[in-house]
Structures are given as C-alpha cells and as structure tokens.
Amino acid sequence: MTSPRKTHPLTKIINESFIDLPTPPNISSWWNFGSLLGICLIIQITTGLFLAMHYTPDTSTAFSSVAHITRDVNYGWMIRYMHANGASMFFVCLFLHIGRGLYYGSFLSLKTWNIGTILLLTTMATAFMGYVLPWGQMSFWGATVITNLMSAIPYIGSDLVQWIWGGFSVDKATLTRFFTFHFILPFIIAALATIHLLFLHETGSSNPSGMTSDPDKITFHPYYTAKDILGLIFLLLSLMSLTLFMPDLLTDPDNYTLANPLNTPPHIKPEWYFLFAYAILRSIPNKLGGVLALVLSILILMVIPMLHLSKQQSMMFRPITQILFWTLVADLLTLTWIGGQPVEYPFVTIGQTASITYFFIIIILMPLSASIENMLLKW
C-alpha cells in the first residue's frame, strides 16, 4: 500500500516540497539561506503578533506602548529585541541568498528570480514601515524623509506624498496606515515565498558547477533537512546572542527619544540594511535623479539575466568575473559604510565613486568579462 504521505492531498504537497524533492547532490551551504529565510519569516510573524497585542498605533501612545512592552509585559523585552534583531538576521540571509544567486547564476531561472526581486522589495517596504512604529525621533524623521522622495515624481508627486501621509505631514493617520501595512505585508511575503518555491520546484535547484544535475539527484530528506538544521542552529545562535548580549548594537540611540516634529536629528539615517541604497540616493545632487538611482539599484537585479553573456551559468570556473563579483561585494560594503556617515568631504566623493562603480560593474564590466572569457575559451 502507498504511504498516505505520498497520496493524501495535503501531505502530498509537503512531501513533494520537503521530503521526496529531487535535489542536486553537490549543493553547498550557500543553498541553506532559502530555508533560513523561511525560518526568519516565521520568527518575525510570531514575535510581531505578540508585539501587536500590546502595541497601540497612535502618535500619543505608540512610544509609551513600546516602553510598556519592554518593561511590563512578560518577556516583552525579549520579544521586542528578537523582532528588531530578527529583521537584521532576515536581511543578512536575504543579501547572502541574492549573492549566491548572482555568483552561481541562479538568475537564469527567470520566474523564480523575478518573484525573488519582488520579495526583496516587499521585505524592504515591510522593514521600513516597521521602523516607523516605535515613534522615536529616527522613526518620525526617517518616515518624513523617505516618503518625501515621492514628491520628486513629476506632476503627481506632492499629491501622492499627501495621500500617503493622510494629511500635510507625517502624523496619526500615517502611523495607523503604516501599522496596518506592516501587519499585512508579512503574510503577502509568505504567499510570494510559496510562489517562489513553486517556480523553483518547476525547474529544480541549480548547483555550484552550473551544469545540469538531472541524471544525479538525491532526496531532500534526510540529507538536506539535516544540513538545514545545522544552518538553523547557527541562525538561532546568532540571533539569540545578539538579542541577549547586545540588543541595541544595530539600533539608533535617537530612536529612544520621543518623536518631535520641531527638532531634527543631526544625522537622519535608516537601519544598516538600507544604508547602501541610501548612500546611492544621497550621492546624486538632483532629487529625481537620486530617487531613480535608488529604485534602479534594486530593480537592476531584474536586468541581470539579460546581461549574462557567458556560455557558463556559474562563476565557479570564471576567474575574471569572480574578481569583479568580489569587487562588487566590497563596493556594497563601502556604500553601506558611507550611508551611515555625515554628508561632508570626503564621504560625498567616496559615495559618488562607489555608486558609479556599482552600476558600472553590473552593466558594463560583468558582460565584458563574460565576452572575454568566452573568447579565451574559443566559444
């Protein structure tokens, strides 16, 4: 008799996705981040749900409700810091997951890659709105600065900003709608992640070599379930170490001051995971130009499959492109550093150079190096 695991309509879906899924035998730990992102999402939804039970989305009580959570609610401090640092872990896993996709040519699975890019944008929107909720100084001014960027859109810009704000400034209406969207978006992310998996399982995973692994597959369970559990242990270790020993390492001290529309903080900056995009935005003196560069710095991911001129999928055997890839990583780290610095010499110049380098490597140098490698291999 066939096992109900393989025949029951519900368990059959789980079986085909996580148990009997044919998987390449040679995928490395870089393939762990997909499952870790799933775990991060579960952690964020769970902790967020408990926070929402005690939080009040109102300008007069939001800040004190967060203080109440950390002081008076049982383990409220832990839930809050797990949620805040969980977002950081989420983005660490996201960036590594995207980096792996770029390095090993996973972007050639177009549907999976494009849904992934939409997932990145949705996650960024969710994190931004979550940062506004504690209603500290950086929450308020971050919301004001970033939503104000919409005013750069010709004709409809200023109307659009007022429509988003629900008034003439960031106020009660803005906070309420941001809370609403921050609550609903993680469930949309979960739905998109399911579609992401659906498209992935249509083609199957790629592998480090970039060659087809169709003739040689192993089942996902027990091999990769055990491997994913190891990744999960490292993730939880990192998250709990951060939460219990250095909970405020990645937060801004200004956010412990109640939002005050009459007092601007000396340096308005977002959380660390947005700093690279913020640096690109600031490096262009023109407002509309900056907004376009900001949007393109993320949407460029969708163009990468078209810029792939190499006859090989993976970068594993392409030393010239490997050098460019790691230069791009260094460039992104530089942008992240610059995003947190004040707008003055020499940071402005470094930011502009790093921003130009970012687009130059992706649009010009990588396709060029692929063509050179093809020529050297006489392909």
Curated annotation (Swiss-Prot):
Membrane topology: Multi-pass membrane protein
Chain sites annotated for binding heme b b566: H97, H196
Transmembrane segments: 33-53, 77-98, 113-133, 178-198, 226-246, 288-308, 320-340, 347-367
Molecular function GO terms recorded: metal ion binding; ubiquinol-cytochrome-c reductase activity
PROSITE patterns for the chain: CYTB_CTER, CYTB_NTER
Cofactor binding note: Binds 2 heme b groups non-covalently.
Pfam families to which the protein is assigned, alphabetical: Cytochrom_B_C, Cytochrome_B
Tree of life domain: Eukaryota
Gene Ontology CC: mitochondrial inner membrane; respiratory chain complex III
Entry's localization field: Mitochondrion inner membrane
The entry's keywords: Electron transport, Heme, Iron, Membrane, Metal-binding, Mitochondrion, Mitochondrion inner membrane, Respiratory chain, Transmembrane, Transmembrane helix, Transport, Ubiquinone
Claim: Transport is one of the keywords in the record: yes
Residues annotated for heme b b562 binding in this entry: H83, H182
Required co-factors: heme b
GO BP field: mitochondrial electron transport, ubiquinol to cytochrome c
Further details from the record: Heme 1 (or BL or b562) is low-potential and absorbs at about 562 nm, and heme 2 (or BH or b566) is high-potential and absorbs at about 566 nm.
Complex formation: The cytochrome bc1 complex contains 11 subunits: 3 respiratory subunits (MT-CYB, CYC1 and UQCRFS1), 2 core proteins (UQCRC1 and UQCRC2) and 6 low-molecular weight proteins (UQCRH/QCR6, UQCRB/QCR7, UQCRQ/QCR8, UQCR10/QCR9, UQCR11/QCR10 and a cleavage product of UQCRFS1). This cytochrome bc1 complex then forms a dimer.
Family recorded in the similarity comment: Belongs to the cytochrome b family.
Function: Component of the ubiquinol-cytochrome c reductase complex (complex III or cytochrome b-c1 complex) that is part of the mitochondrial respiratory chain. The b-c1 complex mediates electron transfer from ubiquinol to cytochrome c. Contributes to the generation of a proton gradient across the mitochondrial membrane that is then used for ATP synthesis.
PANTHER family for the chain: CYTOCHROME B
Protein name: Cytochrome b
Natural source organism: Aotus nancymaae
